[in-house]
């Protein structure tokens, strides 16, 4: 329910880690109209080239039959493809991305007419071809048709929280939104973890946040033991398409690896029970 909590850092590095380190086949879907996750995988020039060649982005999933979209050469009319023809971008072996697009703002925000289920329907079709081990959806921080679509397409959700009062107050609002929205659709989601991000260990702010989560009757059971440390260079690394796995920072990498491992273990345990 709040931006700037390390959501994109967590989602992109989670995908990169399990694809490169674990050899899992992963799809990242960038559902945030600001498409920050996409910019972690593309340079500006490469992204413009990708779009100008008519390749697919999340707009392909949500546009109506005819939609005016902006390109580097001006506005043109696009026709929605069939799901089987919407192809994700292969970043490297095992790692695919359905890029975000600023034009998502131009698609009607109104729900209904099956629009809320388009992402779910697309993933059902796409997974028959690619057989992904995991699909990770990076969502906008506020309630919208895009968040609803992501929730309906998901079995689990992960909550990143920056250790400050505004951020961890927002997790209760997020929980209320998820419960309310999914109740309307009769869809059940499980929380696979609450991850502390941008952490400065030993600070008063961090200790208070950790105490709050540890004592909370609901969220304490979901707290991931490892966390993502604060590094001022992370935005610069992202703009140069560099991931935590490739950085010479053992503490940062160890934290990420622990977060990824625990999230996967939680999901595996849920799957065994069900």
Q: Which stretches of residues belong to each language-model region?
A:
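P-loop NTP-binding core
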Residues: 1-274
